[in-house]
């Protein structure tokens, strides 16, 4: 709470999950799927102890997703369906989750890098007009990740459910001209795993199965350090084969798919996406930065988001970066490679790094009035109030 006893809320709206809670906390109060569902056919009024309503949100919608038509209001980190987004916020602030009176609270929201201005204007409008928060702040996710790590300068590789961003931050400011986006993230890897399992003869086709495969992915998948070696092991031995029990009790065996699915992050062509993979994109981003800042960036690469949780990802990233640096910068001169310093930070709580950084920032700033966009300022200036955040509003 701030000095006037008002709650300070932090809400990280991801494509796949909402993480929300309070300033100063070490963990989100609630984490739930960012989805809205409507019944396909209205037959039974109850399933187990969950009542089927015309509109189901979050956890409830996730549990009954086989009976619902589900929509994710956000796509690739950007709001696409504002009506459903409002339902999601109603659920977040309402009795089901935070149970707050938004008129007496401040809120810190997060946004992806390169968020369109129109999107940001609409968020501000909804927060002040619909929910009437006393103060609002919108922070860029990559900057919050670095705050959570105690840094002001570094490159954030943020890979969530809907989008992967590579975002350099210098002295606490994100550098939009250097920010790169890769439209491959958790959801695409889950889809690819479904396809690979289909080739093995296991059919998963329903949206309820999607959740099952997502959990399987989180439990079994890893990133191969040396892909040729992994493929050899998968072909010639059974060391990679793991059994996995599905919710209905069936047991399936998963082998090479365990590393083949996340490989899409490094080789986008596997899922028919044009462009370079995450390692080369990271290399290109740092090399495009000012020459004086490159060494700092290479030493402060911070992983963030659920799709960076695969075992083996940090070491593979480091290996590929060194290889690219050797080929393209040192022109193959191995002796000079020892001077090339690189450090990839993979904090254990990186799944919720953005929320943690937001909770730190909101706590430090809770009583600094000039930090927040206030309701009075909004009533006076409308969306032009965003200029206070250093955003040019047309």
Curated annotation (Swiss-Prot):
Claim: Nucleotide-binding is one of the keywords in the record: yes
Residues given in the record as ATP binding sites: 160-162, 214-218, 305-310
Keywords for this protein: Actin-binding, ATP-binding, Cell projection, Cytoplasm, Cytoskeleton, Nucleotide-binding, Nucleus
Top-rank taxon: Eukaryota
Coiled coil: none
One GO cellular component term: nucleus
A Pfam family reported for this protein in Swiss-Prot or TrEMBL: Actin
Subcellular localization: Cytoplasm, Cytoskeleton; Cell projection; Nucleus
InterPro entries named in the record: Actin, Actin/actin-like_CS, ATPase_NBD
GO molecular function: actin binding; ATP binding
GO biological process terms, semicolon-separated: Arp2/3 complex-mediated actin nucleation; positive regulation of double-strand break repair via homologous recombination; positive regulation of transcription by RNA polymerase II; primitive erythrocyte differentiation
CDD domains assigned: ASKHA_NBD_Arp2
Family membership: Belongs to the actin family. ARP2 subfamily.
Self-association state and partner proteins as the record states: Component of the Arp2/3 complex composed of actr2/arp2, actr3/arp3, arpc1b, arpc2, arpc3, arpc4 and arpc5.
Function: ATP-binding component of the Arp2/3 complex, a multiprotein complex that mediates actin polymerization upon stimulation by nucleation-promoting factor (NPF). The Arp2/3 complex mediates the formation of branched actin networks in the cytoplasm, providing the force for cell motility. Seems to contact the pointed end of the daughter actin filament. In addition to its role in the cytoplasmic cytoskeleton, the Arp2/3 complex also promotes actin polymerization in the nucleus, thereby regulating gene transcription and repair of damaged DNA.
Name of protein: Actin-related protein 2-B
Naturally occurring in which organism (per UniProt): Danio rerio (Zebrafish)
Gene: actr2b
């Amino acid at each position: 709470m701030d000095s006037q006893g008002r709650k300070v809320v932090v809400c990280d709206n991801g494509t796949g999950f909402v993480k929300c809670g309070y300033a100063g906390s070490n963990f989100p109060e609630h984490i739930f799927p960012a989805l809205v569902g409507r019944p396909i056919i209205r037959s039974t009024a109850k399933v187990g102890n969950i009542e089927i309503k015309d509109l189901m949100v979050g956890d409830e919608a996730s549990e009954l997703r086989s009976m619902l038509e589900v929509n994710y209001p956000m796509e690739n980190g950007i709001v696409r369906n504002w009506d459903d987004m409002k339902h999601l916020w109603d659920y977040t602030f309402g009795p089901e989750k935070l149970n707050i009176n938004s008129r007496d609270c401040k809120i810190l929201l997060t946004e992806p890098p390169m968020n369109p201005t129109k999107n940001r204007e609409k968020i501000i409008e909804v927060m002040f007009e619909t929910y009437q928060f006393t103060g609002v702040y919108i922070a860029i996710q990559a900057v919050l990740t670095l705050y959570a790590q105690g840094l002001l300068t570094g490159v954030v590789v943020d890979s969530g459910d809907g989008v992967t961003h590579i975002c350099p931050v210098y002295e606490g400011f994100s550098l939009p001209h250097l920010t790169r986006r890769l439209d491959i993230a958790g959801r695409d890897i889950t889809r690819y795993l479904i396809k690979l399992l289909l080739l093995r003869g296991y059919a998963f086709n329903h949206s309820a199965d999607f959740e099952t495969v997502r959990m399987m992915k989180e439990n079994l998948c890893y990133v191969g350090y040396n892909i040729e070696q992994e493929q050899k092991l998968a072909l010639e031995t059974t060391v990679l084969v793991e059994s996995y029990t599905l919710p209905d009790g069936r047991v399936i065996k998963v082998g090479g798919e365990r590393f083949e699915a996340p490989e899409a992050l490094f080789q986008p062509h596997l899922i028919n996406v044009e462009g370079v993979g995450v390692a080369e994109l990271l290399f290109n981003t740092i090399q495009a930065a000012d020459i004086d800042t490159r060494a700092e960036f290479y030493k402060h690469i911070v992983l963030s988001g659920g799709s960076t949780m695969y075992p083996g990802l940090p070491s593979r990233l480091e290996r590929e970066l060194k290889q690219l640096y050797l080929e393209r910068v040192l022109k193959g001169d191995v002796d000079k490679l020892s001077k090339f310093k690189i450090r990839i930070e993979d904090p254990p709580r990186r799944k919720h790094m953005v929320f943690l950084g937001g909770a730190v920032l909101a706590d430090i700033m809770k009583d600094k009035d000039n930090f927040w966009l206030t309701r009075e300022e909004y009533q006076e200036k409308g969306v032009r109030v965003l200029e206070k955040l250093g955003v040019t509003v047309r």
